[in-house]
Amino acid sequence: MKLFKNKPVTHLNQIYFYLVAILILRLDLVFLNTMPTGGDMGAHVVPIKYFIENFALNLQLNGWSNDWFAGYPLYYFYFPFPAIVTFLFNLVFPYGVAFKLMVIGSILLTIYSFERLFRNMQSNFSIFGYIAGLTYILTESFTIYGGNLASTLAGQFSFTYSIAFANLAIAHLTKSDKNNRHVVSAIFFGFSLLSHLIPVLIYAPIYLYFWIKAKNTTLEKFSSGLIFLFITIRFTTSLITNLEYT
């Protein structure tokens, strides 16, 4: 007799699971138009605000900020994906709310990425993956490395996004039966790099192993590599060519 029967989880039931996670995140505070603080969080409020007001509408990924006395090169050396997400939220919500939605978005995406990574080819939801993701983000043994809730609220949301996207990249590469899985996987891994470098360095050997092992044609693998380069080359080029100024 099986302890657990493999019963399909409906989309409605999935919503219930994620509502539990959302309740933990105190949406009543998220939608107050206030500025988040704590740890490095306050230091991220200013550059993202400057990005939205001076770069985003000009389709500019990085440039010179006039803040901090004589100014400094903004988003040449740090990762722009969270700023882009905040800009999109800011089209609808005030900046303070948009910033907080971006932050908690990284937490929900991390839970989802674990759940997706734990799925088998036949299932549409993994309760064990969901529990693993929820357990990870609620871990309190570290508060600054990134990935868990405590670190994210201390300003490490870039790291959290990077972990989530790396998980999704591997999940789509190994668990998806869609014809475009190599494309989706490359997009997610590109987003991971645009969020933070350290998780990419950790995940890269694992991703490369499954990328080589994947039963895709040479053309499909080549196209996925081009997509990854297309997404990341603008940021990585400016980073590498200006590295001497860090």
Q: Which residues fall in each region the model found?
A:
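Membrane-embedded transmembrane-helix bundle of lipid-linked glycan/lipid transferases
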Residues: 1-246
